[in-house]
Regions:
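Short alpha-helical transmembrane segments in multi-pass integral membrane proteins
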Residues: 1-28, 85-152, 198-254, 310-375, ...
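Residue-level signal for short hydrophobic patches within transmembrane helices
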Residues: 17, 21-40, 44, 66-73, ...
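Transmembrane helical elements of multi-pass membrane transporters/channels
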Residues: 26-45, 146, 157, 180, ...
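Helix-terminus/linker motif at the lipid-water interface of multi-pass membrane proteins
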Residues: 36, 40-58, 127-134, 190-201, ...
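Interfacial/gating helices of multi-pass transporter permease domains
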Residues: 48-68, 135-139, 203-205, 245-252, ...
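Small-residue-rich hydrophobic transmembrane alpha-helices
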Residues: 57-117, 154-173, 284-342, 346-348, ...
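Hydrophobic transmembrane alpha-helices of multi-pass small-molecule transporters
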Residues: 69-72, 116, 184-189, 218-222, ...
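Short runs within selected transmembrane alpha-helices of multi-pass transporters and secretion channels
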Residues: 78, 147-165, 173-181, 206-221, ...
Length: 464
């Protein structure tokens, strides 16, 4: 049964035949737009919350570590599903493609149940471990509890969008993200500023607007998979989880989850380093993460277009197309990073002004943005290579790089530099860490090229 062949439709055919550069643009642009919209509504959340108070902004910033852990599980599982599904399509294996999709949705439900429990048990101690300010803690508790307890929409939205992206239907994935983002942006000011009552205002309102938007996006993306995606047939009658499919998903997905979890640990501990200076520094750090998402999210969107192309052509044994996809993606990533660098370098006051920055916040934030942005030019290459490792089924390389960058290098460097008593020195730890990251990325890619990509040339003629 597992050898049943897949009758590929036109979108799948073009992944193996269309010229790589226009193909990458065709698949990536919708995802880049949707990621930009995603970044926009994340920023809009903080812009509106900042108008409530700086404490509210700090509370949302402190919530980021646990919230990012939640996203890590959802996105990381989706990465595993995306890579395995696109590879199955390249191999023309219908049965495996269907089982991958069905088990991916099952894992999304399981992930939600885990964070439902965490939302009811660990949120309060999590906040009071970071701050003694009761106002900041209580605002953060209200925000994060809602985000965790009602996170089913987020997990389902992410998984369904990965299924659409893996089958090259990135425009449909973009539509579902746009729906969720637009709903969130509309509801943010309505809830946050108390138009639905004081009990639903402030950080509580921000959380409600977020989860409602996620449920809307989940509903749209699930419908699109059922009605507009003929290359996977979802049939849950008599569904039973497949240990084999889940194992294959997490062989790629677990390193991605762990890699993003490392980011949560880094953020949590960096907040502790910065809190020793002032709570305003934590708010600046939170604002930086919101702002840099405008730079990084388009690249992550391009990755969503790149990974299926690499996965498909890896399965189809077409090494030239794999290499050309990587080169094109890296060129575009560096171009995007250059634009981000220039904006952060020359307009930091304008960017911080979006968040109603006080004079104290501007004094800390302007040099922070100007220093941190130096790592952008290096990060573009690291991000593309990291996704390449995942697309080729070697996510462990991505994990090793992430751990080295954020735990082995960045945090110790930040801690040591904080001992100078000069907060500006702490921001240089990002640049130091990225230098290590990009070096490791190229070392690992050289190994991967030798072990996986080059041997494909032996079979390329027969496949083509």
């Amino acid at each position: 049964m597992e050898n049943k062949q897949l009758n590929l439709s036109e979108p799948e055919n073009i992944m193996g035949t269309m010229d790589v550069n226009p193909l990458l643009i065709k698949l990536s642009i919708p995802m880049m737009i949707s990621m930009l919209v995603q970044a926009l509504y994340n920023v809009v959340d903080s812009i509106f919350v900042a108008r409530v108070s700086e404490n509210a902004l700090t509370a949302v910033s402190l919530a980021f570590s646990l919230q990012n852990l939640m996203f890590a599980v959802g996105i990381g599982t989706g990465v595993g599903v995306n890579a395995l599904l696109s590879k199955s399509l390249g191999e023309k294996n219908q049965y495996r493609a269907n089982k991958t999709a069905e088990n991916g949705l099952f894992l999304a439900l399981c992930s939600y149940l885990v964070f439902l429990v965490l939302g009811l048990t660990v949120v309060r101690p999590y906040f009071y471990a970071q701050t003694a300010d009761a106002d900041i803690a209580e605002q953060g508790i209200r925000y994060l509890t809602i985000c965790c307890v009602l996170s089913l929409g987020m997990f389902m939205q992410v998984m369904n969008e990965k299924l659409l992206a893996a089958t090259s239907r990135t425009t449909l994935s973009m539509i579902s993200q746009l729906v969720g983002a637009v709903v969130n942006i509309i509801l943010d000011p309505i809830f946050i500023f108390g138009y639905c009552g004081e009990a639903l205002s402030g950080t509580t309102g921000a959380a409600l607007a977020t989860v409602i938007g996620q449920f809307c996006g989940a509903g749209v993306s699930f419908y699109l998979n059922l009605r507009k995606n003929p290359d996977i047939q979802l049939d849950f009658k008599g569904f039973r989880p497949s240990a084999e499919a889940i194992k294959r998903i997490y062989v790629v997905g677990l390193p991605s989850i762990a890699m993003q979890c490392v980011g949560s640990v880094m953020t949590f501990l960096m907040n502790q380093i910065l809190m020793a200076f002032t709570a305003t520094a934590v708010a600046v750090f939170g604002v930086y993460f919101k702002l840099q998402s405008f730079v990084f999210m388009p690249i992550f969107g391009m990755n969503n277009g790149m990974v299926p192309i690499i996965g498909y052509n890896y399965g189809a044994r077409k090494p030239d197309r794999v290499k050309k996809t990587i080169k094109c993606a890296m060129f575009y990533a560096e171009a995007i990073m250059l634009v981000g660098f220039l904006l952060f370098q020359f307009l930091p006051d304008k960017l911080l002004g979006l968040f109603s920055a006080s004079e104290a916040m501007l004094a800390i934030g302007k040099p922070a943005l100007r220093i941190i942005c130096f790592h952008f030019l290096l990060a573009g290459m690291s991000i593309i290579l990291s996704s390449t490792f995942q697309a080729l089924g070697n996510g462990m390389f991505s994990l090793i790089i992430s751990v080295c960058r954020q735990l082995v290098v960045l945090l110790p460097a930040a801690w040591l530099l904080s001992k100078t008593g000069n907060m500006n020195m702490v921001w240089w730890s990002f640049v130091i860490a990225e230098l290590v990251s990009v070096t490791l990325s190229f070392v690992f890619f050289a190994r991967l090229d030798k072990k996986i990509i080059e041997p494909m040339y032996d079979n390329a003629a027969a496949v083509q």
